[in-house]
Amino acid sequence: MSNKVHLGHTARKRFGQNFLTDENVINRIVGAISPDNDHVMVEIGPGLAALTEPVASGIDKLIVVELDKDLVERLKEHPVLKDKLEIHQGDALKFDFNQLVREDKQMKVFGNLPYNISTPLMFHLFEFAQHIENMHFMLQKEVVLRLSASPGTKAYGRLTVMAQYHCQVMPVLEVPPGCFTPPPKVDSAVVRLVPYKVKPWPCKDVDLLRNLTTTAFNMRRKTLRNNLKQLLSDEDFAVLGIDATLRPEQISVEQYVAMANHVFDRK
């Protein structure tokens, strides 16, 4: 049998499918997720239910968002899960997670995310951060390193700034390729993202912050003065106390927020 086939389902490259099969890793991830009935439990991309089954076993209801119609049909017929699942067939990148919000419950979101959409999906989820208690995702190890990076490192970039603006970022464990069917060509890791209830550095316009960081990191080797000349003058940098000759990866999240707020106040 092909190593792309697991439990009778062939992994689809266009959906970025790699199915988690290592029981020890699965148990450690479920322990980190800590399923309970006090939160709205949401899984993105349940696949062949490697995480779905153990998470659902200890709770009353689990909401899943799955794009693959064949996998949705399998879940609907699952002998154990079918009565516990609320299934939404569709693209998580376009899904309105506000429809899952309950007045008295925050969401816990988790999933083994397709690596080809993981970054845009996290940006999408940040829009619902005020309704989320925490998120646990299996990602490409490189992405977890970017999420948790410190200023002055190669991994530090736009994703780092936006993730750390919205959330505390904590790597949980590393997962080698052999834990999946088929094995991905890269190492994986699990990360915990905990949205801030109160932002340490409140931004007056998050869209402006996103655009400013995108512009700053478009040319990583050039200085802030060069990259942000359409937004900030030398006088602005002096007022902010930021050295305009620094490169974008040398600037902290707090400083990016200060720059965005300065541009906003000048409007």
Swiss-Prot record:
Q: Which Pfam families match?
A: RrnaAD
State the source organism's domain of life.
Bacteria
Catalysis: reaction(s): adenosine(1518)/adenosine(1519) in 16S rRNA + 4 S-adenosyl-L-methionine = N(6)-dimethyladenosine(1518)/N(6)-dimethyladenosine(1519) in 16S rRNA + 4 S-adenosyl-L-homocysteine + 4 H(+)
- Kindly report the protein's main subcellular placement as a broad class: cytoplasm
The EC number(s) attached to this protein equal 2.1.1.182
Task: Quote the subcellular location field of this record.
Answer: Cytoplasm
Record-linked InterPro entries: KsgA/Erm, rRNA_Ade_diMease-like_C, rRNA_Ade_Mease_Trfase_CS, rRNA_Ade_methylase_Trfase_N, rRNA_adenine_dimethylase, SAM-dependent_MTases_sf
**Which keywords does UniProt give here?**
Cytoplasm, Methyltransferase, RNA-binding, rRNA processing, S-adenosyl-L-methionine, Transferase
The GO terms describing molecular function are: 16S rRNA (adenine(1518)-N(6)/adenine(1519)-N(6))-dimethyltransferase activity; RNA binding
Is S-adenosyl-L-methionine included in the keywords of this UniProt record?
Answer: yes
Specify whether Nucleotide-binding is a keyword of the entry: no
Q: Which residues bind S-adenosyl-L-methionine?
A: 18, 20, 45, 66, 91, 112
Disulfide partners:
none
Question: Per the record, GO CC terms?
Answer: cytosol
The stretch of residues making up the signal peptide is: none
Q: Which family does the UniProt entry place this protein in?
A: Belongs to the class I-like SAM-binding methyltransferase superfamily. rRNA adenine N(6)-methyltransferase family. RsmA subfamily.
Give the protein's function: Specifically dimethylates two adjacent adenosines (A1518 and A1519) in the loop of a conserved hairpin near the 3'-end of 16S rRNA in the 30S particle. May play a critical role in biogenesis of 30S subunits.
Q: What is this protein called?
A: Ribosomal RNA small subunit methyltransferase A
